[in-house]
Curated annotation (Swiss-Prot):
Its main location: membrane. GO terms for cellular component: cell projection; endosome; presynaptic membrane; synaptic vesicle membrane. The record marks E80 as: Calcium ion selectivity. It is found in: Cell membrane; Cytoplasmic vesicle, Secretory vesicle, Synaptic vesicle membrane; Presynaptic cell membrane; Endosome. The keyword Membrane applies. SMART domains: Cg6151-P (SM01077). InterPro entries: TVP18/Ca-channel_flower (IPR019365). It comes from the Eukaryota. Homomultimer. Associates with the dally/ magu complex. Keywords: Calcium, Calcium channel, Calcium transport, Cell membrane, Cell projection, Cytoplasmic vesicle, Endocytosis, Endosome, Ion channel, Ion transport, Membrane, Synapse, Transmembrane, Transmembrane helix, Transport. The chain crosses the membrane at residues 36-56, 67-89, 114-134. GO terms for biological process: bulk synaptic vesicle endocytosis; cell competition in a multicellular organism; clathrin-dependent synaptic vesicle endocytosis; photoreceptor cell differentiation; positive regulation of neuron apoptotic process; positive regulation of presynaptic cytosolic calcium concentration; synaptic vesicle endocytosis. This is Calcium channel flower.
Length: 198
């Protein structure tokens, strides 16, 4: 395999086929999540370096948070853009293994990587750098949930469970009858006899 074919294969990564049985995502979510992940990784590494430089103020927790944030940025960059690490052979295999896993795995991984630096050293650098990684995890979580069902499917499911309003089981004339069971109306009886009117 030539060097040009290797680069082309790595850059074609967003066009790879969706896994069988997984939810189909719109193109803007698929490419947007990758782009957000790349930008998040870059800023996480940059602001992690800023937190590491806080050793000047003798803040060990910010030093550790910066190191964790830089490692998180590196991991996100490896998984989202393995073409940035052409010199490391194992990167493409790791990215393929994670791509084969369900979307919620990647969402949970990104959210778990983003939280510790924020709690260890709360500041703009850790909040922005790790916050972008957390946002990438949130986008992957939305992609893992899949598309919303059509209106007809939701209406049919509501009628099967008896909440449809015009189903066969105990249909009433009031549309809100199935929302709250055993609800009592409010009564306005006036002031209590022992009230001090304060």
């Amino acid at each position: 395999m030539s060097f040009a074919e290797k680069i082309t294969g790595l850059l074609a990564r967003p066009n790879q086929q969706d896994p069988v049985g997984g939810p189909e995502q719109p193109w803007y979510l698929k490419y947007g999540s990758r782009l957000l992940g790349i930008v998040a990784a870059f800023f996480a590494i940059l602001f992690g370096l800023w937190n590491v430089l806080s050793i000047i103020t003798l803040s060990v927790s910010c030093l550790v948070a910066g190191i964790i944030q830089m490692i998180a940025g590196f991991i996100v960059m490896v998984l989202e853009a393995p073409c940035c690490f052409v010199c490391i052979e194992q990167v493409n295999g790791i990215a393929d293994k994670v791509d084969a896993k369900p979307m919620y795995f990647r969402a949970g991984l990104y959210c778990a990587l983003a939280v510790p630096p924020i709690f260890m050293c709360f500041g703009l650098a850790s909040l922005f750098g790790s916050g972008l990684i957390f946002a990438t995890g949130a986008v992957y979580a939305m992609m893992a949930l899949g598309k919303k069902a059509s209106a007809e499917d939701m209406r049919a499911a509501a009628q099967q469970t008896g909440y449809g309003g015009n189903g066969t089981a105990a249909s009433t004339t009031n549309d809100r009858a199935g929302i709250v069971n055993n609800a009592q109306p409010f009564s306005f009886t006036g002031a209590v006899g022992t009230d001090s009117n304060v």
